[in-house]
Amino acid sequence: MNLVRTAMLLAFMTALFMAVGYVIGGRGGMMIALLMAAGMNFFSYWNSDRMVLRMYRAQEVDERDAPEYYGIVRDLATNAGLPMPRVYVIDSPQPNAFATGRNPQNAAVAASTGLLQSLSYEEVAGVMAHELAHIQYRDTLTMTLTATLAGAISMLGNFAFFFGGNRDNNNPLGFVGVLIAMIVAPFAAMLVQMAISRTREYSADRRGAEICGNPLSLASALRKIAGAAHAIPNYDAERNPATAHMFIINPLSGERMDNLFSTHPNTENRVAALERMAREMSAGSTAPARPDNAVRRSRSVPKTGWGRGGSEPPKGPWS
């Protein structure tokens, strides 16, 4: 079923691409856009995970670099019956995490230094279990392709403003059509992202709670991440907003959780669903699930040469 949804998503995104191409250059522009979309879909399928990890300058770690973090992912992957994904750390004080990859055999999980430093062992396990659930449900392919194509559609819409309005380019709709393309194409891409992310986050929350065995640890983590995510900026996410739906909590500082156009469900609704799940589990168990009250363990964060306590990450080639 996920493969069918992914195919429908790619078809819709391709149609958007072609529509903007038509506005820019008529039938010829539409055909060029079709070829571009086909090439981009092919390239994104094989490379979008690497592109996203590169956007966030994620660094791969192993058991020697981050034994506790790596061990959490390894044990949870075993619980879920999944191959061991590649494990990455993102240099960002904002607590957050995401998963990417075209299938469970070629998947990766990434957590920020802020998450590893501010959450308890059990809360980190809940977050990583959520990300492994996305991998198990093959959401990662759809989310990563959506991020890549939505960003491209937005850029093409801006391109239309500069090259779609003059009369010599075979544009059948004129400047009005260009304005429509600039507004409608990115907005439609955003609606697709919303529909994908909102429905899949609930499923990943539930499956993640099953994998880690404690819904309340994940609920506690969501509350902490949501509380910090909009107070601590993620500069790379601000530069690449099309990837926001990939994170466990929206990383954009301007995002309000009650916003009609949020890429994520309301955090309190997610927490309430996990608390209901905990009560259901408690009813069938002699050891009821409890909130995470454990003292936060000291956690080794990989020695990557990153600064600590800075308000802005080091500048990279995209800055």
Swiss-Prot record:
Chain positions recorded as Zn(2+) binding sites: H130, H134, E201
GO cellular component, one term: plasma membrane
Cofactor(s) required for function per UniProt: Zn(2+)
Entry keywords, A to Z: Cell inner membrane, Cell membrane, Hydrolase, Membrane, Metal-binding, Metalloprotease, Protease, Transmembrane, Transmembrane helix, Zinc
Localization terms from the record: Cell inner membrane
Residues spanning the membrane: 6-26, 28-48, 145-165, 172-192
Region feature Disordered, mapped onto this chain: 279-319
Membrane topology (UniProt): Multi-pass membrane protein
Keyword Transit peptide assigned: no
GO BP annotation list: proteolysis
Location of the active site: E131
Pfam families assigned: Peptidase_M48
Gene Ontology terms for molecular function: metalloendopeptidase activity; zinc ion binding
Domain of life: Bacteria
UniProt EC number: 3.4.24.-
Family in the record: Belongs to the peptidase M48B family.
Protein name: Protease HtpX homolog
Species lineage: Bacteria, Pseudomonadati, Pseudomonadota, Alphaproteobacteria, Hyphomicrobiales
Originating gene: htpX
